[in-house]
Amino acid sequence: QTVQRLSPNAVVQSVACDEPDDFARPLHIRCDFAAPRFVLGDGQQRMLALPMLQTIFGDRTLSDLFGQTGPAERKYGLKLWASRRALFEETIKLPAGWTVKKLPEAVDMDGPSAGLHFKIESKEGEIQYTCDLIIKNWIVPPADYANFKQVMEKFEELTGRVVTCEREGGHAQR
């Protein structure tokens, strides 16, 4: 059901997950899935959202982070559930004949309360990326809030970025 939030056509091929309620160690999820008709657009070019950056597995681990960056500054510390690291690693296999025309830019931010590192590359029918979101404090002090705000706004921006693809030979077909 979780993967179908990406697309009603998504089909899980395999999944492996640690115990999600064991907070003594990192949570690892590996999910192989196919999502036919996941791309947007018609004609030669298509737009592809980065699936795992839609944070479909983030219900228990990231939901308290979103919507916390409204004010420009804070008088009091911002309380979060916990400090944490969310590392997204994904490989997307493109259909035969597709090439990548434009990738989102890399991001490398670090500060006293949060960090964000995003790298993406394409090669021979695949797109590979890593996105490392690090929340260093469970209470973000007012002096460090600007860093937290900047990192979270950039992360939220990344969740909406797309990869532009093109079908070799000039015509994209479904």
Report residues per predicted region.
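A sensor for short, sequence-defined functional sites
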Residues: 1-174
